[in-house]
């Protein structure tokens, strides 16, 4: 599987979606800018990269690290918001202040509600 990325540009506060080609230099991040007139490689060190988990939510939307998803812990509980994070060992997890689980176990139960950059307020609702 070829890794897919999206990026949050910390300078312009814009989320850049795939297809996003990325090259990691010694101290630089190069991205291929298809939106520019010359379709050129540009250096942007103000990026926060988010890799695709390779999984989709219950609506078929691709889940990236940094997404905020909504999911009920069980059939009796109200939906809660969770951040998608990469944990030690490389596994993707759903994390909230009170609960966490492996993403691969519950990805078909969750729905993408936003991301940590554009919707940080979702994670404060607990």
Segments from the language model and where they lie:
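Secondary-structure transition motif
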Residues: 1-126
């Amino acid at each position: 599987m070829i890794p897919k990325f999206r990026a949050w540009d910390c300078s312009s506060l814009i989320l850049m979606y795939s297809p996003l080609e990325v090259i990691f230099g010694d101290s630089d991040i190069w991205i291929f800018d298809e939106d520019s007139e010359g379709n050129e490689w540009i250096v942007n060190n103000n990026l926060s990269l988010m890799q695709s988990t390779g999984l989709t939510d219950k609506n078929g939307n691709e889940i990236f690290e940094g997404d905020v998803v909504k999911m009920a812990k069980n059939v009796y509980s109200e939906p809660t918001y969770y951040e998608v994070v990469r944990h030690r060992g490389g596994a993707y997890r759903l994390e909230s202040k009170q609960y966490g689980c492996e993403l691969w176990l519950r990805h078909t139960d969750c729905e993408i509600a936003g991301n940590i950059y554009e919707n940080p307020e979702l994670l404060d609702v607990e």
